From Swiss-Prot:
It comes from Nitrosococcus oceani (strain ATCC 19707 / BCRC 17464 / JCM 30415 / NCIMB 11848 / C-107). Its cofactor is a divalent metal cation. Transmembrane segments: none annotated. This is dTTP/UTP pyrophosphatase. GO terms for cellular component: cytoplasm. It catalyses: dTTP + H2O = dTMP + diphosphate + H(+); UTP + H2O = UMP + diphosphate + H(+).
Length: 196
């Protein structure tokens, strides 16, 4: 469906986000954006993902030369257990602790998407509930040894081997991957309408 949406800049180096945008035919330029992803004191998970998605989009806007700037899409994903944000694990030990917390229970995955064209910004939020089966020690060890979840929020990748752990998903598969396509399509569609 190329041509349905205007070209944009993606404030992310995530291969998953790039593949998801390509899946819906969006032409994009990739921007390597670094923002501090530390939660603020007493920050709610929804506020956290909104803040980071917007920070990434704004940083991407500022990174482009003024002439020929493209609208910038930023996204952020958080895995939430009992209102606690599980970010990307610092190391294998922390990833193991996260998997243990997720084992045999449900958690939420929040992904916020922000699109900015300068001073103006739009947002969308995807909220999904993911249920893990009870993991055995061998399953945890094998998954940790794979290294697959070490750079992912909550220490797992739904599109990889961790799919074997998920007994139920309510919400957006692409949102759990890191870029909810329905919400992204809404933002890009609104941008396209304003260009007419």
């Amino acid at each position: 469906m190329r041509g349905l949406f205007p070209p944009i800049a993606l404030a992310s180096t995530s291969p998953r986000r790039q593949a998801l945008l390509a899946q819906i035919g969006v032409e994009f330029k990739r921007l390597d954006i670094k923002v501090d992803e530390s939660p603020q004191p007493a920050e709610r998970p929804t506020s956290y993902v909104y803040r980071l998605a917007l920070a990434k989009a704004r940083a991407g806007w500022g990174q482009q030369p003024p002439r020929g700037r493209l609208p910038v899409l930023g996204a952020d994903t958080a895995v939430v257990v009992e209102n606690e944000i599980l970010g990307k694990p610092a190391d294998r030990a922390q990833a193991g602790v996260m998997l243990t917390r997720l084992s045999g229970r449900s958690h939420q995955v929040l992904t916020a998407v922000a699109l900015t064209n300068g001073d103006e910004a739009q947002y969308r939020l995807s909220v999904s509930t993911v249920t893990f089966k009870r993991l055995t020690k061998d399953e945890c060890e094998a998954y940790l040894a794979s290294g697959e979840g070490l750079d992912k929020a909550g220490a797992y990748a739904i599109q990889g081997w961790a799919a074997l752990f998920i007994s139920r998903l309510e919400g957006s598969y692409s949102g759990v991957m890191g870029l909810p396509l329905y919400e992204t399509g809404e933002l890009l569609g609104n941008l396209q309408e304003r260009k007419k």
